Amino acid sequence: MDAIKKKMQAMKLEKDNAMDRADTLEQQNKEANNRAEKSEEEVHNLQKRMQQLENDLDQVQESLLKANIQLVEKDKALSNAEGEVAALNRRIQLLEEDLERSEERLNTATTKLAEASQAADESERMRKVLENRSLSDEERMDALENQLKEARFLAEEADRKYDEVARKLAMVEADLERAEERAETGESKIVELEEELRVVGNNLKSLEVSEEKANQREEAYKEQIKTLTNKLKAAEARAEFAERSVQKLQKEVDRLEDELVNEKEKYKSITDELDQTFSELSGY
């Protein structure tokens, strides 16, 4: 009986121990289940986080691809803008060279115009000298004509007296000799006056030819002055056009430089965004 009691006590003790172990195991099981649930929740959260990160990564990669495409396009636009700026600089240089050549031609034309004006003044002075000389020659010719008239009058008077002496030849030989001497003197003077008149006529013709040549040179100088004036106006017009073109090109260069600065700022902003995105991805 005692053995049975001891055995029952032992079995009860063993039962209690088993119950304690069962409670302990049940508690451990609950804790394990809780840990498993937490782990599953954490795994689920991690999976969701991973999916979100994958989605974010896809979006970032897509944004990066777009940014790279935009960057390539911006680089192309920048290269094109730099090419246009270089072309504009070349055009500006050519225009400046053309402007310098125009200024040189303008200075040359101005110098030639001054020389032509001086030559025209000299021609005007020569023309006035020739006019004065022509007036002097006309006065001299008038004097010679008066002398010629006087000589003719003397010749006629001599002839008349010669006829009178001839009629009185038989009566007064002395008067005849004096009349003949006077007649011979008058004829010699007539010959001298005729010779002088011929020389004056030749001089007058030469003077007329010289005056005609002077008039022709004056017309040529006037035409040359007119041509140089037209060239001067054309050079001034080209210079003014070149100056307006340079101002217009300078405005275009300023506009392109502003666009270039804006594009560089946009490029820097995109680069900063990419660096920030890479930093965030590296943090995860």
From Swiss-Prot:
PROSITE patterns: TROPOMYOSIN (PS00326)
GO molecular function, one term: IgE binding
Region spans: Disordered: 1-51
Disulfide bonds: none
Transmembrane residue ranges: none
Record annotation: effect of changing T277A: Nearly complete loss of allergenicity
Signal peptide (from-to): none
Biological processes per GO annotation: regulation of muscle contraction
Residue stretches in coiled coil: 1-273
Pfam family of the protein (one): Tropomyosin
Region (IgE-binding): 43-57, 85-105, 133-153, 187-202, 247-284, 249-260, 266-281
Stored InterPro entries: Tropomyosin
Keywords: Allergen, Coiled coil, IgE-binding protein, Muscle protein, Repeat
Regions of compositional bias (Basic and acidic residues) in chain numbering: 12-45
Assembly: Homodimer.
Assigned protein family: Belongs to the tropomyosin family.
Note on domains (UniProt): The molecule is in a coiled coil structure that is formed by 2 polypeptide chains. The sequence exhibits a prominent seven-residues periodicity.
Note: Constructed epitope mutant has significantly reduced allergenic potency, and hence could represent a candidate vaccine for treatment of shrimp food allergy.
Known function: Tropomyosin, in association with the troponin complex, plays a central role in the calcium dependent regulation of muscle contraction.
Protein name according to UniProt: Tropomyosin Pen a 1.0102
